[in-house]
Regions:
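A short, Lys/Arg-rich alpha-helix, primarily the initiator
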Residues: 2-29
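Residue-level signal for the short linker/turn that defines the boundary of a DNA-recognition helix
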Residues: 18-21, 31-32, 47, 62-65
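Generic structural marker for isolated residues within well-ordered, non-membrane alpha-helices
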Residues: 23, 34, 38, 67
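Short alpha-helical DNA-recognition segment
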Residues: 30-54
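DNA major-groove recognition helix of helix-turn-helix
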Residues: 41, 56, 66, 82
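DNA major-groove recognition helix of helix-turn-helix/homeodomain DNA-binding modules
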Residues: 63-80
Length: 85
């Protein structure tokens, strides 16, 4: 189950939105759809399009395994998803 954003943790909603925005920008630059980002290059679905949408819009906090998957699909180091945030 995806981790919901906790508004009681100072800065968490803003941080989650920034990470989601960064992933969306990289996804669009790469020319991938949300469904393609959530799947492997061979089409095996790891993360549903709805999860990707919720993550990109800051409604859910991505797990470490989700971040690792997205970084791999976007051909960027995992640290690039968080750099400067």
């Amino acid at each position: 189950m995806p981790a919901r954003v906790n508004p009681d943790v100072p800065g968490e909603p803003r941080l989650v939105r920034k990470v989601g925005k960064r992933i969306r920008e990289l996804r669009e630059k790469k020319g991938l759809t949300m469904a393609e980002l959530g799947a492997s290059p061979k089409g095996v679905v790891y993360f549903q399009r709805q999860y990707v949408w919720k993550m990109e819009t800051g409604r859910v906090a991505p797990s470490l395994s989700a971040l690792a998957h997205f970084a791999k699909r976007l051909d960027v180091p995992l640290a690039d998803l968080l750099r400067g945030i």
